[in-house]
């Protein structure tokens, strides 16, 4: 007997070898997909009737700062320097481990509700984020943020904590948690420190998550300090490779794109955050043309202000059409691939497609909605019309986290109340 059967669904596999099923069934057992077809002879403990719905791989958010849900709407419509130095950094300085847990749990709740089944996170007090992931049932690739700032003592302390975290949590939560090293950015970490991080990552077989050329300020600072841009510096020290996840990548030259493609670097495109902070427009179309694996991320809620990857997909598709003056740029299915297949590749997880033998991370999207009627093209609807709130069921590792809009994995009201209280108390401490 199977654990779960999802039936009567439009099955969007995202598997290029199989295509979609207009009326299909997905069978799940022991956390994996065991059968996909029109019908099954199997019976199951749980049967989900997905009539008028799409079953698809869960979305993958490849760059966020989960605990920053506590800063949602806290400091908007400000110049970047004022936003960071006058508001975000002072607030972060007052965060406690308990705050990070409550903020991360709120992020997990939001992602379960909006169809994200796995995410990559960089922050601090990361044991608390890992505990939140463990409790929520989601899948995540986590790292402790390392900000050395050319201070050797601080760098040694940060790297020690990063290493401890990598080793403590790798493979935890029934394998749902992966760990990475998280040097913040080339303009906040010295060349020597970045080389040390690369060595430690090699030693532990861990990936690396880094911010890269998010702003023009980084580009100018790197050229002034090193006489070269961030990508060329990282290339020169042997830092880049297919285990590197680079967030933002806005201020890339054509030569930078060539290097990223050659080294197999994974990019997280954070389109809404980049627009909100006026960082610029990442050359996504050029990156994809050069074979760079481009995925999607939301960044933290302080600069987005939510974790809805459906919004991210639509915005990415629209921005790059107008930016290239080409309505055919980033068609719907390609954007869906960025949000699923490419994201899973970036995090090195056996997810992102509905395929026999792969981990059962999938969502059911309710298509019987006014804004989704009529439906001529399912991929188009998912990108241009659907919202995170249309997700009715979320399954991760073969466990139902939300069924028919009811969250089963967490006490939803308590999570929201605890986060609201934590945010209010945090602001009180900041203003004291």
UniProtKB/Swiss-Prot annotation:
EC class of the enzyme, as a word:
hydrolase
- Stated EC number for the protein is 3.5.4.41, 3.5.4.31, 3.5.4.4, 3.5.4.28
- Write out the catalysed reaction: 5'-deoxyadenosine + H2O + H(+) = 5'-deoxyinosine + NH4(+); S-adenosyl-L-homocysteine + H2O + H(+) = S-inosyl-L-homocysteine + NH4(+); S-methyl-5'-thioadenosine + H2O + H(+) = S-methyl-5'-thioinosine + NH4(+); adenosine + H2O + H(+) = inosine + NH4(+)
The entry's free-text remark on the cofactor is:
Binds 1 zinc ion per subunit.
What Pfam families does the database record attribute to this sequence?
Amidohydro_1
GO MF term set:
5'-deoxyadenosine deaminase activity; 5'-methylthioadenosine deaminase activity; adenosine deaminase activity; metal ion binding; S-adenosylhomocysteine deaminase activity
Q: Which SUPFAM superfamilies match?
A: Composite domain of metallo-dependent hydrolases, Metallo-dependent hydrolases
> What cofactors are annotated for this protein?
Zn(2+)
One biological process term from GO is: S-adenosylmethionine biosynthetic process
Which residues of the sequence carry a binding annotation for Zn(2+)? Answer: 63, 65, 211, 299
Q: Where along this sequence does the record place binding of substrate? A: 92, 184, 214, 299
Kindly tell me the pathway this chain contributes to.
Answer: Amino-acid biosynthesis; S-adenosyl-L-methionine biosynthesis
Return the Gene3D superfamilies for the record.
Metal-dependent hydrolases, Urease, subunit C, domain 1
Q: Which UniProt keywords apply?
A: Hydrolase, Metal-binding, Zinc
Subunit structure, interactors included: Homotetramer.
Q: What does this protein do?
A: Catalyzes the deamination of three SAM-derived enzymatic products, namely 5'-deoxyadenosine, S-adenosyl-L-homocysteine, and 5'-methylthioadenosine, to produce the inosine analogs. Can also deaminate adenosine. The preferred substrate for this enzyme is 5'-deoxyadenosine, but all these substrates are efficiently deaminated. Likely functions in a S-adenosyl-L-methionine (SAM) recycling pathway from S-adenosyl-L-homocysteine (SAH) produced from SAM-dependent methylation reactions.
- Which NCBIfam families does this one have? PRK06038.1 (NF004701)
What the record says about family reads: Belongs to the metallo-dependent hydrolases superfamily. MTA/SAH deaminase family.
Task: Give the misc comment.
Answer: SAH is a product of SAM methyltransferases and is known to be a feedback inhibitor of these enzymes. As a result of this inhibition, organisms have evolved efficient enzymes to metabolize SAH via different pathways. The pathway found in methanogens differs from the canonical pathway, it uses the deamination of S-adenosyl-L-homocysteine to form S-inosyl-L-homocysteine for the regeneration of SAM from S-adenosyl-L-homocysteine. 5'-deoxyadenosine is a radical SAM enzyme reaction product which strongly inhibits radical SAM enzymes.
Query: What name does this protein carry?
Result: 5'-deoxyadenosine deaminase
Protein source organism: Methanosarcina barkeri (strain Fusaro / DSM 804)
Gene that encodes the chain: dadD
